[in-house]
A protein has these predicted regions:
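Structured catalytic-domain cores with a bias toward divalent-metal coordination
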Residues: 2-463
């Protein structure tokens, strides 16, 4: 590229980036939670809910979130609580998935599952919604007149602690729930099925000495220059598809789906198998999995997988189209996807994605149910992508330095089961957990509304 043309390209990228960041600063008041204004949710004429300070619902680290969740569940007398250990940190503290089961009339009203933290850092939003729901005046107190309610808190505790989406093995847990033999799937999956390798120089640039990730020039300008020719050749949707489809051949890359089932998901699948009374034998099941990142700022998009194996015995007799208008729109959601091929702009590019957790359970469930991901928007998609690329570069460089130092992140005692887990992503917190009073309030209101709508639907559609 001629030097004059290169200079023009650089200037355009710099100006564009500056304008974009200036535009989106209005969404980020950068107020770390100390005291938020009260918020009110009017669900219907009889049910109005309020929270004096949403900051009390949010946490800044995993251990704080876990402590708040456990304290909230202890306020109830008849609740079954337990934890699945996933890892142990250097201070001998367990990093766990915490489970709370609020018993209900399962044979008549079914089961509702609410999960947070599958993507680690995104769990701070899900945890806040769960705490808001656990206030005494929100959940129906009569066990005979409600479904069984299950909260799964921090499905990816290591990612939540490290402020990353991936887990302790750099695996994206929402690409890891593969049906059948995973080894066969990995061996037969084309590594470039979604053009991941075509975008490699942007998604996973060669940076052997950590020069690029430490360069302000690369982080603000250079990476865009790296990307522009690829965007010109393939387009933005192709870039998004290359990222979100997941890949199974590069353990150091982004959206890595792994080559074996990860401990977190093994715990959840075992829980499913061991409690048929709550899952397999339940006449209906609604599963809400909370995510952040895609879509309009502070608003929720719904990606759902209806399970209607036998319409004649369906718990939810509505067609997917009727559910779309009667169920999801009343939950304040702005976009939704019924199945592959019928997708909103938020979920464009996911047609090749495999291993999604809600999709997995929708397929193994043998009755009628609704399995959905509720996604709260933060930044524009390409800025989310920027954060993911930079975080992975820094994380891999950090791990490489630890390896060269000879400790590999293992504690001084040499116990391979106890890891440091001291990495904290400086990029993904802002991308997936923006410090904004507006965003915090919107997430709580919309997250609670969807859960209440699910409860309402379950009790109105009993057999």
């Amino acid at each position: 590229m001629p030097s004059f043309t290169r200079l023009i390209v650089v200037q355009v990228v710099v100006i564009f980036t500056a304008v974009l960041y200036n535009f989106f600063t209005k969404f980020f008041d950068n107020t770390v939670c100390s005291k938020d204004p009260p918020i009110t949710l009017k669900f219907d004429e009889q049910h109005v809910y309020s929270w004096d300070d949403t900051c009390q619902l949010y946490s800044l680290d995993y251990k704080e979130a876990r402590g708040k969740f456990q304290a909230a569940t202890r306020l109830y007398e008849n609740v079954e609580t337990f934890s699945f250990p996933v890892a142990i940190d250097s201070s001998n503290e367990p990093l766990t998935i915490d489970v709370a089961i609020f018993p209900g009339n399962t044979p008549e009203y079914g089961t509702i599952v609410h999960s947070s933290g599958l993507h680690g850092v995104e769990g701070y939003a899900g945890s806040a919604i769960q705490l808001a729901l656990l206030q005494k005046d929100v959940l129906p107190l009569s066990e005979n007149n409600r479904p069984t309610i299950i909260f799964l808190h921090a499905l990816n505790p290591v990612g939540m602690q490290e402020h990353r989406r991936s887990n302790e093995n750099n695996v994206d847990l929402n690409r890891n729930s593969i049906h059948g033999n995973m080894e066969d799937f990995v061996n037969h999956r084309d590594p470039n099925i979604a053009n991941y390798e075509s975008f490699r120089r942007f998604l996973h640039p060669t940076d052997p000495d950590g020069f690029l990730i430490e360069s302000p020039w690369y982080r603000t300008v250079g990476m865009w220059i790296n990307l522009l020719p690829l965007l010109y050749q393939y387009g933005f949707v192709a870039l998004k598809r290359a990222m979100v489809s997941g890949q199974y051949h590069d353990p150091r890359g982004i959206f890595y789906g792994g080559n074996e089932l990860q401990p977190s998901l093994q715990h959840v699948q075992n829980f499913w198998d061991q409690r048929p009374d709550l899952f397999r034998d339940s006449p209906s099941l609604v599963w809400i999995d909370i995510h952040t990142g895609l879509g309009p700022f502070g608003k929720d998009s719904i990606h759902y997988y209806p399970s209607f194996p036998n319409e004649t015995i369906s718990r939810f007799p509505q067609t997917p189209a009727e559910l779309q208008s009667q169920y999801f729109l009343t939950s304040h959601s702005v976009t939704m996807s019924v199945k592959e091929g019928e997708t909103s702009d938020t979920f464009v590019g996911y047609d090749l994605s495999k291993g999604l957790m809600t999709s997995y359970f929708a397929e193994v469930y043998n009755s009628s149910g609704i399995f959905l991901a509720q996604e709260f928007g933060t930044l524009p998609a390409f800025l989310v992508g920027r954060g993911l690329v930079l975080d992975n570069m820094l994380y891999q460089e950090t791990k490489q330095r630890e390896k060269k130092a000879g400790d590999g992140g293992i504690t001084q005692s040499g116990d391979s089961d106890r890891q440091d887990y001291s990495y904290r992503s400086p990029y993904l917190s802002k991308v997936f957990f923006p410090q904004s009073t507006t965003w915090r309030a919107s997430v709580v209101k919309r997250g609670v509304a969807l859960m209440l709508q699910s409860l309402d639907l379950s009790t109105k559609t009993k057999t």
